[in-house]
Amino acid sequence: MSEDKPHQNLAVIGHVDHGKSTMVGRLLFETGSVPEHVIEQYREEAEEKGKGGFEFAYVMDNLAEERERGVTIDIAHQEFDTDEYYFTIVDCPGHRDFVKNMITGASQADNAVLVVAADDGVQPQTQEHVFLARTLGIDELIIAVNKMDLVDYDENKYKAVVDEVNQLLEQVRFNTEDAKFIPTSAFEGDNVSEASENTSWYDGPSLLEALNDLPEPQPPTDAPLRLPIQDVYTISGIGTVPVGRVETGILNTGDNVSFQPSDVSGEVKTVEMHHEEVPKAEPGDNVGFNVRGVGKDDIRRGDVCGPADDPPSVAETFQAQVVVMQHPSVITAGYTPVFHAHTAQVACTIESIDKKIDPSSGEVAEENPDFIQSGDAAVVTVRPQKPLSIESSNEIPELGSFAIRDMGQTVAAGKVLSVNER
């Protein structure tokens, strides 16, 4: 790991089949992050299976089942360097039922690349991903208008997609000045690492140049430690090893830490990153660590690790601002869907709908409405059905956003305004 460069977590978002995996594979390939012989092996495998051209995406699809289906599933962490930054890609899958990955993934991202196919334009998932990125606090968006090779590198096709995406960004109040558009072909490699002769009409940066120009994220090291647990492993000779990404603060060996809502604590013995032992971990670092006196059955995915003397909040109830994206009917008090917050998934009841908000102005449109529906924004009071650690978004924004899922889809997303602790 390059210690001397700042780190960025990059989400790659967009509609299914618009070329996200191929783009990620191409970025890794162009930055020398994938050895040539591995690419060759993938190429042979892809051709044998009649999927020639998928070799870059194969870099991302490590799971045999995914390869067979031609679909990318779990979030894959991949790393590459530019001159300025050390990037971890959070490859966010695009299939309908993978949106919750997108939520746990995007909340971990500093910035995002939105991939939109030039021959297909803005699609429902494009809208949903942009909306989620906005709600979850991604500020800088690089839009790769991809598959330019399929529209013969036609500038008018490119401009039409740019207009369409800009309209979408304005709808969700994303500052369009913070959006950079680049015509690309991940498959052919146009404008990924260097300017392409096929788009002589375009004089902007390549994708890697645009990534290199991103502002440096300011790590929330001053905030108290918050580290949501993704998995818990038992490793022989070490013991129980929780794994997760530091969202805020610093994890040091020797720290006394507490896991909430499981409510167990202990001393950090070792911290490992990329299979190397490190003295401490900072925001953005994906780490495994071992805590004295904490067993595998004491903690689970969805717990949050924090200092024993400033433990993560556990909500009895919380007030939140939500935006309903798609719900087949209406949402009323008593509705109990599943909330996805950081790595936790907990059924929560909307106890009351306190205010309806006008999404365009942010003003209160109605007090105590009877119901809300798709397109509405509202302030609601929520009661988790089992213990949930969540923070107010103005105190620890990294742990203050969530998605609401029901019926196999994301129905709403939101952020926590205040927590009434248990």
Curated annotation (Swiss-Prot):
G1: region residues: 14-21
Binding site for Mg(2+): S21
Alphabetical list of SUPFAM superfamilies matching this protein: EF-Tu/eEF-1alpha/eIF2-gamma C-terminal domain, P-loop containing nucleoside triphosphate hydrolases, Translation proteins
G3 as annotated region, ranges: 91-94
Keywords: Cytoplasm, Elongation factor, GTP-binding, Hydrolase, Magnesium, Metal-binding, Nucleotide-binding, Protein biosynthesis
Subcellular location: Cytoplasm
Region annotated G2, chain positions: 70-74
Stretches assigned to the tr-type G domain: 5-221
GO cellular component terms listed in the entry, alphabetical order: cytoplasm
Region (G5): 185-187
Superkingdom of source: Archaea
Positions contributing to GTP binding: 14-21, 91-95, 146-149
Reactions catalysed, as given in the entry: GTP + H2O = GDP + phosphate + H(+)
Documented EC number(s): 3.6.5.3
Positions of region (G4): 146-149
Molecular functions per Gene Ontology: GTP binding; GTPase activity; translation elongation factor activity
Pfam families in alphabetical order: GTP-eEF1A_C (PF22594), GTP_EFTU (PF00009), GTP_EFTU_D2 (PF03144)
Similarity remark: Belongs to the TRAFAC class translation factor GTPase superfamily. Classic translation factor GTPase family. EF-Tu/EF-1A subfamily.
Purpose of the protein: GTP hydrolase that promotes the GTP-dependent binding of aminoacyl-tRNA to the A-site of ribosomes during protein biosynthesis.
Protein name per the record: Elongation factor 1-alpha
Lineage of source species: Archaea, Methanobacteriati, Methanobacteriota, Stenosarchaea group, Halobacteria
